[in-house]
From Swiss-Prot:
Alphabetized UniProt keyword annotations: Cell wall, Disulfide bond, Extracellular matrix, Germination, Secreted, Signal
Entry coiled-coil feature ranges: none
One GO location term (cellular component): extracellular region
Protein purpose: Secreted thaumatin-like protein that, with calA, plays an essential role in early conidial germination with a possible role in cell wall remodeling.
Disulfide bridge partners, by residue number: C136-C164, C141-C148
Compartment(s): Secreted; Secreted, Extracellular space, Extracellular matrix; Secreted, Cell wall
Signal peptide start and end residues: 1-18
Phenotype of the disrupted gene, per the record: No visible phenotype. The double deletion of cetA and calA results in cell wall defects and lyse during germination, leading to the inhibition of germination.
Annotated gene: cetA
Pfam families in the cross-refs: Bys1
Induction profile: Expression is inhibited by PKA activity and is subject to glucose repression. Expressed primarily in conidia. Expressed and secreted during germination and early growth.
Protein name: Secreted thaumatin-like protein cetA
Family assignment from sequence similarity: Belongs to the thaumatin family.
Length: 176
């Protein structure tokens, strides 16, 4: 009788181990990150830049998207997701972020684009955090606004940097 119980227990343990087990993949930063949605009528190209440049990602016109979980830059600096309507990283709008303890610091930068002629300026863009506060606001640069005060227009525009809890997710909508 004891042998039968042991045999049944061993058989059940073997069968349980053989069943498919759910796999959980945890990327750096957990599930928090940024999703960029292209609602414009032209394709957008994206590169994630740390101490190197990622492959180019294409966000198709009319709703194509790119999602990136927050990552740390191996050289200790921030990360820049460069967005362009050209495949050569010219005239770029940037979503920039840096992980620091329990805070994600982020901003939008228009420094490296011709604001008067840019497709991003013509169509507008906005950033919606999953949780907002005084230090973690939404950002909206309306279509045609060449002087959007909520984005970096020159290197010293530090008022455009925001700090949010590290578990905040963002949606950047192009063509808002």
């Amino acid at each position: 009788m004891m042998f039968t119980k042991a045999l049944v227990a061993a058989t059940l343990a073997t069968l349980t181990a053989a069943l498919p087990q759910p796999t959980v993949v945890r990327r750096e930063g957990g599930d928090a990150g940024v999703t960029i949605v292209n609602n414009m009528d032209s394709d957008v190209y994206a590169w994630s830049v740390t101490d190197g440049v990622s492959k180019m990602h294409t966000l198709s016109s009319g709703g194509g998207s790119y999602t990136e979980n927050f990552q740390a830059n191996p050289n200790g600096g921030g990360v820049s997701i460069k967005l362009s309507t050209h495949q050569d990283q010219t005239d770029v709008l940037q979503f920039e972020y840096t992980k620091s303890g329990e805070t994600i610091f982020w901003d939008m930068s228009c420094i490296d684009m011709d604001r008067a002629a840019s497709t991003f300026t013509k169509n507008g863009f906005d950033v919606s955090p999953s949780q907002t506060s005084g230090d973690c606001p939404a950002v909206n640069c309306h279509a045609g606004d060449t002087s959007c005060a909520e984005a970096y227009l020159q290197p010293k525009d530090d008022h455009a940097t925001h700090g949010c809890p590290i578990d905040t997710s963002f949606t950047l909508t192009l063509g808002a």
